[in-house]
């Protein structure tokens, strides 16, 4: 079987996702699709709009054959760890031939070239990176500047204003990290990319005659009439959303506030909360009335909105240094969220070709700190979304789609 892997959040599943899935099947000419999907918390450092089982149903309705969960520790991390967790999981299955992801540039050769430079770290590139970091630039910006200078020195034929745009676009950044992970793992999986169409990844406004971003759809659902989002989602996705409940960001703020006020040292356990940002959060926690307000009071050139969101999410989930160290290795298990008949065949192939632990039922799973953390994350999510109960991970079986 020719199997394609895709890495998603489906938060929620919209027309852009439907196009990506269809195009991924066409461009790779595959026999089946495995989707690695974030669970109940996502890469922005927020609870998913709706739970992972509802989003699994959306994926299966759309034509994904097998949905597996990206462990929460990777799912709530920066692009580098998010990508490594997802790619290493797909690689460990030993059945995936291709990976297909969206990008703003749609240029797989450029993405691969940039990935090679970053992973190989030529001495001159390292020197430039060091210099830009000394200037106080945040790491992503310093790396972008170092890449541009290195390519310029090596007479790489490219418009540098275009390259700067490439290096500062959300999906391109993830695409580079996916390819970087493939190089790091010496994987035989072949990467493909599809140019992202429609609204920008971070665009929060719905616009007629355009594919909307998930951000805009979530904002519409949270702030106005849900029916506004109908034109931007497949009907099956909309109907599933209509019959479920959504996570409550105000409750998340209350829980984060409680965690920090009751134990200010909780921030010291999170390596990302360094350089005085922990003190800034503590100073502003009493002034803010919402998560958004707290982040806007604390953000700076070095600490972006999303980076702060992830730090606060890790406070909520009580992440510590020992847990974060697990991100350096591939997950030892694959958690099955749902499958169809073809997905059942793919599972048989995984069992034949891979030694990875396949988790269908948690009651039979081997002990694993990443899996235990997922269970805890779902239990915390149950305080934010009334459709999820404590211990839902034990109570809900993989979804079988016929």
UniProtKB/Swiss-Prot annotation:
Reactions mediated catalytically: cytidine(34) in elongator tRNA(Met) + acetate + ATP = N(4)-acetylcytidine(34) in elongator tRNA(Met) + AMP + diphosphate
Pfam families with a match to the protein in the record: HIGH_NTase1
Oxidoreductase keyword on record: no
Gene3D superfamilies, per database record: HUPs
Gene Ontology cellular-component terms listed: cytoplasm
Top-level taxon in the UniProt lineage: Bacteria
Keywords on record: ATP-binding, Cytoplasm, Ligase, Nucleotide-binding, RNA-binding, tRNA processing, tRNA-binding
Binding site for ATP: 7-20, 102, 171, 196
Role summary: Catalyzes the formation of N(4)-acetylcytidine (ac(4)C) at the wobble position of elongator tRNA(Met), using acetate and ATP as substrates. First activates an acetate ion to form acetyladenylate (Ac-AMP) and then transfers the acetyl group to tRNA to form ac(4)C34.
The protein, known as: tRNA(Met) cytidine acetate ligase
Species this chain originates from: Clostridium perfringens (strain 13 / Type A)
Gene assigned in the entry: tmcAL
